[in-house]
Amino acid sequence: MAGFSYFPHTDADVRAMLDRIGAGKVEDLYADVPKEFLKKGPYALPDAMSEPEVRAWLNALAGMNAKMKVFAGAGAYDHYTPSVIPYITSRSEFLTAYTPYQCEISQGTLRYIFEFQSMVCELTGMDISNASLYDGPTAAAEAMKMTVACAKKKNRVLLSSGLLPHVVKVVETYAKFHGVTLGYLPMAEGQTSLEALTAELAAGDVAGVIGPEINRFGLIENHTGFADAVHAAKALLVEYCDPSALAVIKSPAEWGADIAVGDGQPLGIPLCFGGPYVGFMGVKKDYMRKMPGRIVGQTTDKDGKRAFVLTLQAREQHIKREKATSNICSNESLMALWCTVYLSLMGPEGMRKIGRAHV
């Protein structure tokens, strides 16, 4: 068996198998293959290449592809991911999608979730954020439910036609099974129509309005007057935003929004056939008890040291059951960490440079 890196069949093994199937020799197994297609003798394969040589060869092949400007995306973008991020987030102590059940024991996990929440609030200008949601569309759908929960007796929500199509589809699915009626605001010269919004609000049955900061056409929307009109109708304004642009454009809070949602994928999360991504949500403090998902809060332990806990849990489904604000519990904690590391590495000036490049 010299020369083999594995244990091959012995001649006796081969003979026993051939006898079992009634074949005289191995070549008889290929009797149906035309002789001109049978290979005789060894293959003329080149010597094995080293890893750097293989990489260089593959890169040369890839270099033959034509590189075009990509205008596709619709919420999933091929942004640069610093190589240190996968290294940090793949560490065994971080590698989980869950917020912990024995939360006080997992201070490291709670700390980075708290930092994620803090960064979301800094980007959006909101007062409080949660530990994350499944993705941007889910965050928008949860915001839709939240506006209805806050309005109590109103169950109609208006969606801008400038929202990304898959966001609208998920919101429609949630609305169908929660008894929420949806209305759609038309576009006027690439912007959500304020005139149409005002007309829809006049009916007095609108609980919330969801509009994009950057719409499906790639245009930055001007939402001047939106918050005033929505609040005058005693409804809530939800801004769906791209976090990579928030360092250079108006934040949802500056537009007067009550809720800010979006997808964290632009914050260095690579494309991978649609996921996993991470949704984020920030709200004004008046509405924090209606916000879905888990919330990490900061406190002090018995020795006076800073500590982190899961707070406001009475609103969650493991306590309130069917009366909970949402069924969201487990989340995209690992992807939230990914965004946190990305934002920490880029810093304020780095995010401004990225924002200017994007818009």
Language-model regions, residue ranges each:
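Buried hydrophobic positions in well-ordered alpha/beta secondary-structure cores of metabolic enzymes
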Residues: 29, 120, 171-172, 209, ...
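PLP-dependent aspartate aminotransferase-fold enzymes
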Residues: 79-94, 98-205
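Active-site C-terminal subdomain of aminotransferase-like
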Residues: 267-356
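Conserved active-site segment immediately N-terminal to the catalytic lysine
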Residues: 29, 253-270
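Active-site phosphate-binding strand-loop segment of PLP-dependent enzymes
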Residues: 190-244, 266
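N-terminal entrance/gating region of PLP-dependent enzymes' catalytic architecture
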Residues: 31-115, 121, 319
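Short gly/pro/ser/thr-enriched loop/turn and capping motifs at secondary-structure boundaries
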Residues: 164-166, 244-247, 266-271, 289
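Charged, compositionally biased N-terminal leader segments and the immediate start
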Residues: 1-18
